[in-house]
């Protein structure tokens, strides 16, 4: 007589076999009704014999508990992104770099696959059993989505076959079929009056849903595109293609559109073939991925901190749609730059609704020869940024009105001035223009300037509209009674903002210069100016020749700085901020050190992580004052990497390049500043 244990084991094996054929081989060998019947039998038997339920049972993909939150999980090796190209020349340059890096003329073979538009995840198997899954996250640390990934039918909970490594990492994409996406949106909109913008967003939201049962309902699909065995298997695999086929034999889904190419013609033909099939597929792709097939060569070629050097994504040209231009509005930026924005009938491109696109400047309007109600072609550059490509002039009405760039500011009616060199048109009325005033004030109190907690754009806009503030000085005379009359600002929040305004008075010369919002003067340039002049009065009284002497500050920015401090109203405002509002530039301690060469003088430095003794902005200011050059990217020219807690990929890149690494304790000692 067959025991209950034997019945359960037999049912599991049958169901796992059917799942393998259906999800991996795309073959349905039994009807849905038959499958459901067997599944129900197993479920009821396990319900009565819970001690007999293993983690790889088909029933464990339903009925999981609801997660409260996703914990962070570190990847065994970084999950890198891919370099992109949109044309043949980009691919040829990629191949040329590879040839150069391997120093030989041996024929190369490439493994070409579909670039699925999904969510990248990592899955770990131990002894062939699914143990964990994580999203890419920042490449080094992702979200632990183990419970939700278990709900995806195409992810096997137990591998089958031989030569399965003790530990195996599978990487691939989770995506949603277009047909399922349409059904989900109909249901979602009906119940919640909301919808997902595209299948990828739907897949990402479903994968991270707090309830794994919802993930199960969404019918997500997984496809493997790579793996890591950690240790050598009994049968050594030498190519990427062999690894994928091995994964397939273990029951891991791999997309069937894979080819090995040995010539440029073969790769381009595959690209064209997939481009033609793209719209007929039931899932989104945005190109093909070209990988060096040899694992030995992959290792030799290596990776950057962002992407493997041995692979590239050959993306499809941006999709285009035809629509009608309704209007062009001219927006006024913080520095007075006038930017035309085209508004048109909404169109869907790559699953996203688009109704406007920046026209950048006057030259673009003239190039397009835009008229109202023109028929226009819209695309998404890189499948991301909306762009107006061209006008179909043959469809233009005879009486169509041409769009003319204004001669006066659309907000304050001041005459606009054109800078031929910068190809920009500006309103020079500064803070007397409401549009510039609002954005300039928000910039003045933003994080890298004189940061005030809780003082966001909405509050600033309302303060300006009510006439409570006209310039930065007015903020230092605000009282909590002024703030309470604003929307969504109570007594507690108003006191918090007032206290933060008082605290922001103590700042650095660099932050103060940056806060002024001089055109072209960003955080780095502000630091260089502060480091050069040391004192605010020296900067205010400088001439063009002095400004041109500052390394990294070009003629255009020098002129902008000179013009700013040559304007009487600007000088008066700066003086009032210091003398009346009481802004204190706390750089004295740094100035003493600045006069002599230090350990960091003229050294290229990169920062990573969180520091105990300083904020990132404070540390940058100190290092700049010591003559250092701050960079965001690690290279062979970098002299030092300074790291704090929770450091990122730059740390590992620095190790690879033998860059000197300095920790927080060493840093405090070297800069000779008390904590």
Swiss-Prot record:
Pfam families: BRCT (PF00533), DNA_ligase_aden (PF01653), DNA_ligase_OB (PF03120), HHH_2 (PF12826), Nlig-Ia (PF22745). DNA ligase that catalyzes the formation of phosphodiester linkages between 5'-phosphoryl and 3'-hydroxyl groups in double-stranded DNA using NAD as a coenzyme and as the energy source for the reaction. It is essential for DNA replication and repair of damaged DNA. It catalyses: NAD(+) + (deoxyribonucleotide)n-3'-hydroxyl + 5'-phospho-(deoxyribonucleotide)m = (deoxyribonucleotide)n+m + AMP + beta-nicotinamide D-nucleotide. Residues 595-675 form the BRCT domain. This is DNA ligase. GO terms for molecular function: DNA binding; DNA ligase (NAD+) activity; metal ion binding. InterPro entries: BRCT_dom, BRCT_dom_sf, DisA/LigA_HHH, DNA_ligase, DNA_ligase_AS, DNA_ligase_CS, DNAligase_adenylation, DNAligase_N. The active site is at residue 115. GO terms for cellular component: cytosol. It is an enzyme of class 6 (ligase). It comes from Buchnera aphidicola subsp. Acyrthosiphon pisum (strain APS). SUPFAM superfamilies: BRCT domain, DNA ligase/mRNA capping enzyme, catalytic domain, Nucleic acid-binding proteins, RuvA domain 2-like.
